[in-house]
From Swiss-Prot:
Subunit organization: Homotetramer.
This protein's record includes keyword Membrane: no
Keywords: DNA-binding
Region described as Disordered: 110-141
Iron-sulfur recorded as keyword: no
Protein name (database record): Single-stranded DNA-binding protein
A single BP term in Gene Ontology: DNA replication
GO cellular component, one term: nucleoid
Compositionally biased tracts (Acidic residues): 116-141
Residue ranges annotated for the SSB domain, each copy included: 4-108
Organism whose genome encodes this protein: Thermotoga maritima (strain ATCC 43589 / DSM 3109 / JCM 10099 / NBRC 100826 / MSB8)
Protein encoded by which gene: ssb
Amino acid sequence: MSFFNKIILIGRLVRDPEERYTLSGTPVTTFTIAVDRVPRKNAPDDAQTTDFFRIVTFGRLAEFARTYLTKGRLVLVEGEMRMRRWETPTGEKRVSPEVVANVVRFMDRKPAETVSETEEELEIPEEDFSSDTFSEDEPPF
């Protein structure tokens, strides 16, 4: 039996992305997007709500996110839902859902005078950078 874990979201960045690096030097960029949930037609008591998703990118996609994404930009994110687990200094176990993205695309346009040629032509890699075990000097097979 095979299982499937894929999530596609469209939302706006709630703040500028944050960048850090793994111990091996791989760039990691995180950002949060707000996604509106529209009320159902058959449920008049439903109110529009907003969900917030933490997005994580690795490698070249992380460099792209750091360089071109800013607060307020509308983006499409495609990736996998993961559960990040850690323990606090007091020994309390925590779990937090996050989306490990392998595709990030603009869904809006910046005003023409602020868009760089590089930004509009950039092809976002659709590779899986969720593993920190690769080396750029080694072939991928």
